[in-house]
Structure formats: C-alpha cells, structure tokens
C-alpha cells in the first residue's frame, strides 16, 4: 500500500490503534481473529506492535472497523 518503512514507534502506535479499535467495537480477540482469518498469536503481535499485517489483512481490518487503511495504519489518529 505504502512504500515507506514502518519504524518501531509507528508499529507501536499501529498496535495501540488496533487494540483500541477492537475494544471500542466490543469484540474479543477470538472474534477479530476469526473475522480476519488470522491466528490469535498473529493478532496479538499486531496489537503489541511486534508485527505489521500484510496488505490483504490491512484491508480486512479496515473493513471490519469501517475505517480506511490510511486512517488505521498511516495517520495513527483513527480512535
């Protein structure tokens, strides 16, 4: 989606956003991982900022939370 490299600080902010979005939506980790088609461990790594989702998963996340990919992964101000 974007060519710029994600720094550790960006990854931490993205992880925080993902966790806050899930909590605001009232969804469990199990529900989100099932909706995205990823394992619980992958979701946990996304939320801790240890791993950035592939573009395909970013799109699924954006659809799940009704946000744009840019809002969630590039502005860090979606929540």
Predicted features and spans:
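Short, charged recognition helix plus adjacent turn
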Residues: 1-9, 63, 71-79
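A short, Lys/Arg-rich alpha-helix, primarily the initiator
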Residues: 2-24
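Short basic helix-loop element that most often maps to the first helix and adjoining turn
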Residues: 16-35, 60
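Residues in the recognition helix of alpha-helical DNA-binding motifs
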Residues: 35, 46, 75
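DNA major-groove recognition helix of helix-turn-helix/homeodomain DNA-binding modules
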Residues: 37, 56-71
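Recognition helix of helix-turn-helix/homeodomain-like DNA-binding domains
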Residues: 38-52
């Amino acid at each position: 989606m974007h060519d710029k490299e994600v720094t550790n600080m960006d990854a931490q902010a993205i992880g925080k956003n993902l966790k806050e979005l899930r909590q605001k939506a009232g969804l469990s980790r199990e529900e989100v991982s099932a909706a995205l088609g990823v394992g619980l461990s992958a979701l946990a790594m996304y939320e801790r900022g240890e791993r950035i989702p592939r573009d395909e998963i970013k799109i699924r996340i954006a659809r799940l939370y009704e946000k744009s990919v840019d809002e969630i992964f590039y502005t860090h101000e979606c929540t």
